[in-house]
Amino acid sequence: MMMCSANLKFFPQLGWADFFRASFSMQALYTVCFYIIASCIPVVSLAGTFSVNPTRIELSKGIPSAVMHVTNSGEKDTTVQLHMLQWSQIDGEDQLKASRDLIATPQIFNLPAGSRQIIRIGMLKKSDGSVEAAYRMILEEIPPPPPPGFLGLQVALKISIPIFIKPELISKAENNFEINLNRSNEEEGNIHLNMLNKGSSHVQLLGVKIFADDGKENLVASYEKNLYLLAGQKKILKINAGKKIDSKGFLIKANMNGGVVEFHAKSGVP
């Protein structure tokens, strides 16, 4: 009753019957507006879904080929196309371009719902014996033609698989990987990790944790994303601690190639 009285203040000229008729009219208007707005929102149509195993491939002079399984776990048939790309980096940023160093067959195939396709990958170019070569194989879903009158957006799945051709001599990553730490803004807690991979093969970082090197190992900042640093590459990793950093020394624990490696670093200001 109190709510009705409050609402009547906005309709001083209406009686109770007129008020309820107006309320129902407004409700109908809101309903019409809702359907008009909803009709303007594009419909998103998802194509099929597929998975791959393994999720990375390593080849070498002694192992020049590999097999991958692509499984359609969805309820619809789908078509998948393969693209082979050479993978390089400039200051740690990925650069991709088409390559014929590797072959993958079949390059395009239909994948019925619930089925599995075998992909065979092989080397067409001899590996460089001193430095690892890196590639990316893109598995791209080709969505079917939209039905007549469909005005929405079709979303197709794309998976990128790293492929490495190992050099003949591989040195331990931790012996050829360097991390230095700089603070670009002490008050705001901005940290720059200068990373350098001097080795002949890639380094995969699965996360970095930075602690105060004061014996208590209080966590200062962390980076939880996955990244690759290819052979001979460098990268500046920018991390924000979200608070002022008082420590002068740091203990950096890097989850690198499946193991945790520790680095001691002193703070510097670039």
Question: Where in the sequence are the language-model features?
Answer:
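Beta-sheet-dominated interaction scaffolds and their linkers
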Residues: A47-S73, K172-E188, N226
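Asparagine-centered strand-capping/turn motif at beta-strand->loop junctions
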Residues: V70-G74, N194-G199
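Surface-exposed binding patches on compact interaction domains or structured appendages
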Residues: S73-I121, D214-E217
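Short, hydrophobic/aromatic beta-strand segments
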Residues: K76-M84, G149, H202-V208
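Intrinsically disordered, low-complexity Pro/Gly/Ser/Thr-rich segments with frequent PxxP/GP/PP motifs
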Residues: S99-K126, L219-I245
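Terminal connector regions
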Residues: K125-I170, D246-P270
